[in-house]
Amino acid sequence: VWDGSVSTNWNDANNWTPAGVPTLADCVVVPNTANDPIVSGASYDALGLNLTIQNGAVLTVNSTNDIIINDWVNINAGGDLQLNNNASLIQINNNSNTGTMHMDRTVNMRRLDYVYWSSPVTSFGSNAISPGTSAGYIYKWIPTIGTNTNGWGNWSATSETMVLGKGYIVRGPDSFTNTLQNYTQNFVGVPNNGIINMPISRGTYDGINYSTGVSTTLATKDDDNWNLLGNPYPSA
């Protein structure tokens, strides 16, 4: 059990009752204390058999660090797991999680740049990615929509709840300029875990190579096999 009696340092044995930094064999409970735990360092791995974050408590995992849990994560109402940019939650077994976490991902982009995104949490709307971007510039790729007489795929505007494992492409915020700047997306929801199946689709064209009209490189019958997939897990 975390007590935070010394500091916010997860890796300090004196912050735990009984004294000792948790291993993969230890159930980890984070109650509401004056010092919320922070996982920090240079690619440090925090460990636990399972993880419970109680009401009022926040566990923060700093950039480039991981928390590795053998089984499940339970975030009580009013508690929070905060994964900063390039931090990861890694789970060994296919247990279901409960509760809401926050996960940041930062990209460097301009207004007219497009970035590929995939959701690490359940029930996250595609229009919640970069809410400062006009709705008409959020797309998914559909291989079976024809862009020419030969039936190759196409981008399709969307505002759907993000399908786990599917990739989406979103333009930079309307307020951005042509100068590169950071944009941080915050994903909020139940962290994904376990086996996630993503159906693959393709077009039906089976003819000769053809011109797409946008490149001198000819497309082939295999070019409608492309699917845009994304990492559905809260890992860097």
Which residues make up each language-model segment?
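N-terminal exported-region signature
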Residues: 4-236
